[in-house]
Amino acid sequence: MRRSRGFRSKTRHKLQKVKRPGRSNPITRKIQSFNEGDLVHIIIDPSIHRGQPHPRFHGKTGRVVGMMGKSYVVALKDGNKDKQLVVRPEHLQMQE
């Protein structure tokens, strides 16, 4: 039987959550808001599957260009190509 090549394949360490006391999923990550033009880091929270971008974009930085429902549309470059991702706010962090 062929091996599965699912959405989360080869992410054993990339999507691993660091165990620290008192570090569950805070509600503030879910209700944070961004404005158009803000620079954000894509940091995937592996315990929340909804609105998760592909793991190849984990750690990348992009610019918020709009909203789509509760999610944000983030524009970034993947090599030479411009791409737009639809990502929920749990997987985004504001660049400082």
From Swiss-Prot:
Organism per entry: Methanothermobacter thermautotrophicus (strain ATCC 29096 / DSM 1053 / JCM 10044 / NBRC 100330 / Delta H)
Annotated region described as Disordered, given as residue ranges: 1-29
One Pfam family it belongs to: Ribosomal_L21e
A GO molecular-function annotation: structural constituent of ribosome
UniProt-listed SUPFAM superfamilies: Translation proteins SH3-like domain
Name recorded for this polypeptide: Large ribosomal subunit protein eL21
PROSITE patterns in alphabetical order: RIBOSOMAL_L21E (PS01171)
Gene name in the database record: rpl21e
InterPro entries registered for this protein in UniProt: Ribosomal_eL21, Ribosomal_eL21_arc, Ribosomal_eL21_CS, Ribosomal_eL21_sf, Translation_prot_SH3-like_sf
Matching Gene3D superfamilies: Ribosomal protein L21
